[in-house]
UniProtKB/Swiss-Prot annotation:
Function description: Cysteine protease.
Enzyme class: hydrolase
One Pfam family in the UniProt entry: Peptidase_C1
Name this polypeptide is given: Ervatamin-B
Entry EC no(s): 3.4.22.-
Active site: C25, H158, N178
Post-translational modifications: Not glycosylated.
Family the entry assigns: Belongs to the peptidase C1 family.
Length: 215
């Protein structure tokens, strides 16, 4: 595997978005992963609709939370997902618009072996990967720069996306895309320590990784 991967430098990652006061991190994580694999497969980087997932994915709970795999399944079953432009974000759950376009589709989704950071690294080398982390603690919330080493627990309360990895001064890290706007963290991103002692990964990052597949 390459020692350094950053999908942003390959133009495969959209600019940072902001979920605002809505518990829709799951939709932002899923959409970002889909945007990236679509760019990798087709060469087109299109901003897609988190709001469609919030309004239309009945397996999830809108602004009260959800899971990325349910979001991927919605996109598969629906035959695609609309663009951000056609179905813009409002940060509140509304009724599902019947006239929505199927602009980008996926074939399926794959779970990465749980609690295994080397399997996770292998997956991220091929495309950005959706993961869950515990983000409720003050140290995570107040992160600004450098490699975050905790402390944090492993409750799966926030969905984010790993868009790369590397090593700095002997410390391995993940490049993690958040959905709290560009003013949070390091321009919307957090570098999280990688290959920690716990198999769950820092803040539980290796507990539930998955990614969308596209032929």
């Amino acid at each position: 595997l390459p020692s350094f991967v950053d999908w942003r430098s390959k133009g495969a990652v959209n600019s940072i978005k902001n979920q605002k006061q809505c518990g829709s991190c799951w939709a932002f994580s899923a959409v970002a992963a889909v945007e990236s694999i679509n760019k990798i497969r087709t060469g087109q980087l299109i901003s897609l609709s988190e709001q469609e997932l919030v309004d239309c994915d009945t397996a999830s709970h809108g602004c009260n939370g959800g899971w990325m795999n349910n979001a991927f399944q919605y996109i598969i079953t629906n035959g695609g997902i609309d663009t951000q432009q056609n179905y813009p974000y409002s940060a509140v759950q509304g009724s599902c618009k019947p006239y929505r376009l199927r602009v980008v589709s996926i074939n399926g989704f794959q779970r990465v072996t749980r609690n295994n950071e080397s399997a996770l690294q292998s997956a991220v080398a091929s495309q950005p990967v959706s993961v869950t982390v515990e983000a409720a603690g003050a140290p995570f919330q107040h992160y600004s720069s450098g490699i975050f080493t905790g402390p944090c627990g492993t409750a799966q309360n926030h969905g984010v996306v790993i868009v790369g990895y590397g090593t700095q001064s002997g410390k391995n890290y993940w490049i993690v895309r958040n959905s709290w706007g560009q003013n949070w963290g390091n321009q919307g991103y957090i570098w999280m320590e990688r290959n920690v002692a716990s198999s769950a990964g820092l803040c539980g990052i290796a507990q539930l990784p998955s990614y969308p597949t596209k032929a």
